[in-house]
């Protein structure tokens, strides 16, 4: 059998990595100039998801400490849709498995499946969000930004999805998936996210990008008016990812 000519090649995978995690987070948060926006005594809800984000306990702790330094009263809310068996206790167990507890974080974790309706989508579905987060003085949205396994677009899995599905708890998650089944995630997630941005006191977001080895490649603090633009820019910035339309 005659084989075609072959050449040896070597794959070089770009894998950027944040060297000093806490220092980088502090610098990012300071860049938002939040002094006038964080009032002393303000109750700030910080989202805590269920995905296995590397160093998520350290990331959340640094954000919490930053808020405390500005005399706010932060607390964590599990923001994971229906994960953890769709129960308040189950979601606390999920966070515990990620080393996120009241002891390790130094703040209360208010876990509840109660939601409130803050509006309706253009498809006439209710927009539901965690009641305790909705009643807070400010919300910090924290999530990993990465490609989604079921769809491709400028907004996939990240801050917008955390608001639309994570903060929606079980009931809100169900409503989003109903709409997505008919109209697609590319339309539904950005729309629900924008309604939440318009109706709730979103203080800022923290987008986390991981490299191909699941190490933190980049962390970006994002003002609410820049969620769309920054998330789209960060989506493939971790290295090792190739957009299909670029092949």
Predicted regions and their residues:
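Short glycine-rich or small-residue beta-strand-to-loop segments that form or flank ligand, phosphate
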Residues: 43-52, 75-80
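An acidic, phosphate/nucleotide-engaging active-site surface
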Residues: 90-154
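N-terminal amphipathic/basic leader segments beginning at the initiator methionine
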Residues: 1-24
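Catalytic cores of enzyme domains
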Residues: 144-247
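Glycine-rich phosphate/diphosphate-binding loops that line cofactor/substrate pockets in enzymes
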Residues: 29-45, 68-71, 246
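Active-site histidine-anchored catalytic micro-motif
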Residues: 57, 73-90, 120
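Histidine-anchored nucleotide/phosphate-binding helix
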Residues: 54-73
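Short glycine/serine/threonine-rich phosphate/pyrophosphate-binding segments
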Residues: 53-60, 85, 148-151, 162
């Amino acid at each position: 059998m005659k084989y075609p000519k072959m050449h040896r090649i070597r794959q070089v995978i770009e894998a950027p990595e944040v060297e000093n995690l806490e220092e980088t987070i502090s610098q990012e948060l300071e860049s938002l100039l939040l002094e006038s926006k964080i009032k002393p005594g303000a109750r700030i809800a910080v989202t805590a998801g269920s995905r296995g984000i590397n160093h998520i306990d350290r990331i959340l702790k640094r954000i919490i400490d930053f808020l405390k330094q500005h005399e706010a009263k932060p607390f964590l809310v599990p923001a994971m849709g229906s994960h953890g068996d769709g129960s308040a206790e189950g979601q606390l167990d999920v966070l515990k498995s990620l080393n996120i507890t009241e002891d390790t974080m130094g703040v209360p974790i208010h876990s509840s499946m109660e939601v409130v309706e803050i509006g309706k989508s253009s498809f006439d579905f209710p927009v539901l969000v965690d009641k305790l987060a909705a009643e807070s003085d400010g919300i910090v949205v924290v999530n990993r930004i990465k490609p989604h396994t079921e769809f491709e677009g400028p907004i996939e899995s990240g801050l917008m999805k955390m608001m639309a599905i994570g903060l929606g708890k079980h009931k809100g998650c169900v409503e989003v998936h109903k709409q997505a089944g008919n109209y697609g995630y590319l339309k539904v997630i950005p729309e629900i996210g924008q309604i939440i941005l318009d109706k709730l006191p979103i203080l800022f977001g923290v987008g986390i990008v991981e490299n191909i080895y699941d190490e933190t490649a980049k962390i970006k603090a994002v003002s609410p008016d820049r969620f769309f633009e920054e998330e789209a820019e960060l989506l493939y910035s971790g290295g090792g990812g190739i957009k299909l339309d670029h092949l």
